[in-house]
């Protein structure tokens, strides 16, 4: 299974993402730049890492979402290719219209960098099939604008159709996200956006491997 990592000016978690994928799959992902208009046909998983694309000017992810490469990402997603955006990558997916809702400034108005606990609220997706329903996993967060919001109708649909796949466990919501939402998928289930950083917990020697199953599930391999 082959993966691709999207590179944009200002992202700073691309090396972490590349290292995680290389360790899990045994091969380095291909890298695709912001001005590229296509993604290799044999790619099974596209990842948009975290950071501060284009300095977070206008809104987080707003400029990145309008780069040529995102049209290529959109075309792949429409064909069923797995797409995953983490932190700024999640913000970009929202700005690109690939996922519903918005990410606002943290309720504390402060940058938050710490470990949180996540509840797996839907283990019946390709991304989360390596977990058990209700399982609590550890994951670090590092963001200033991670407060997820959506209107009542959108929230009802997300909750009712099982599109909320990760929720901050009780008492650990770091940003004020509505319904403690930490990660969602699209209706088809092949596009995931989440604020926490699973790529930073894939080796026991580095503090834990709770994030490993997420990548393995998306690629259809054994964790």
Curated annotation (Swiss-Prot):
One of its GO terms (cellular component) is cytoplasm. The active site is at 87 (nucleophile), 197, 199. Its EC number is 6.3.5.3, 3.5.1.2. Gene3D superfamilies: 3.40.50.880. GO terms for biological process: 'de novo' IMP biosynthetic process. Part of the phosphoribosylformylglycinamidine synthase complex involved in the purines biosynthetic pathway. Catalyzes the ATP-dependent conversion of formylglycinamide ribonucleotide (FGAR) and glutamine to yield formylglycinamidine ribonucleotide (FGAM) and glutamate. The FGAM synthase complex is composed of three subunits. PurQ produces an ammonia molecule by converting glutamine to glutamate. PurL transfers the ammonia molecule to FGAR to form FGAM in an ATP-dependent manner. This is Phosphoribosylformylglycinamidine synthase subunit PurQ. It comes from Brucella suis biovar 1 (strain 1330).
